Structure formats: C-alpha cells, structure tokens
From Swiss-Prot:
UniProt-listed CDD domains: PPAT
Binding site for substrate: S9, K41, T73, R87
Name under which the protein is recorded: Phosphopantetheine adenylyltransferase
Lineage: Bacteria, Bacillati, Chloroflexota, Chloroflexia, Chloroflexales
Record gene name: coaD
Pfam families, alphabetized: CTP_transf_like (PF01467)
GO cellular component: cytoplasm
Subunit description: Homohexamer.
NCBIfam families: coaD_prev_kdtB, cyt_tran_rel
Amino acid sequence: MRIAIYPGSFDPVTYAHLDIARRATRIFDRVIMAVFDRPQKRLLFSTAERLQLLQAVTADLVNVEATSYEMLTVEFARQVGACAIVRGLRAGSDFEAEFQMAQVNQTIDPNIEVVVLMAGRQFAHISSTAVREMASLGRDPVEFTPPVVVAALREKFAQRG
C-alpha cells in the first residue's frame, strides 16, 4: 500500500487543500492529511479544532484520513509508513520555501519522496490567510472553504467581538 502524508497548518482548511488531497488519492492508496501542532506559530484555531474541522470535511473522501502530529514531518511520515510527503503549490512564490523544506526532508530520510502538486487554476488564489482575513472583516468565505469551516470562522470571530 502506497501511503502519503499531506501535512499543513490547515488554519483553516480550504477547498484548495481538499483539491490537493483528492488529486493525491489518484497517486497514492491512502492520503493522511496531518495537522501540524506548532505551539510557536500564532494560529486562529487550536490543533484540536483544526483536526475536528479537517475530519469533518474529509469524512466523505475515499482513502483520505485526518490526524495531527507534533514531530518533524519526515519523522511522522516514517512513523506512519508513508513513502511520500505531498505538498501543494499555488504560485511560483511558494516554490523556494517548499524546495528548501524538501531538501531538508530528503537529507533526513532520502527514502521519503516529496511530491508537489500544482493547485488547480480555480484554487490557485485561495489561501488560509485570505480566508481568515475575509472572516475577520465579517465576510463569509463560502467560495473558498466548506460550510462547516465558515460556521467555525463565524463563531470564532464572534467570540473575539
């Protein structure tokens, strides 16, 4: 069985993330979308909230599961028996950071490949940052993220006042 992990902050998960996951299932038998628990990064949603949202929006996706992890990504990949780390690119500006991270991961474990999927044209403009920004300004980003995420954003920003 060919397993890949698709790691990310998913703060929040967007249609672009889900598109990459769906397309990755054409290449791999199982895709694990993994929420990276980064205490040092300032995030809108907690790890538990991000995981809950990710589980909700992937429930109907065949061969996709959601989990979280707290270690180096390549070590997590090794732990779950993954042969690859899937990354999505929206624009050329994403390439440099992804390339550097791929080099680090290949140095740590050359047996785990990094597979980069280009964002589909209809999703290339979507980012979690833009979704959070819209929601913070009172606009429901319904075109960019599933309804359960829109509801969670609405609730989160209502709590903040």
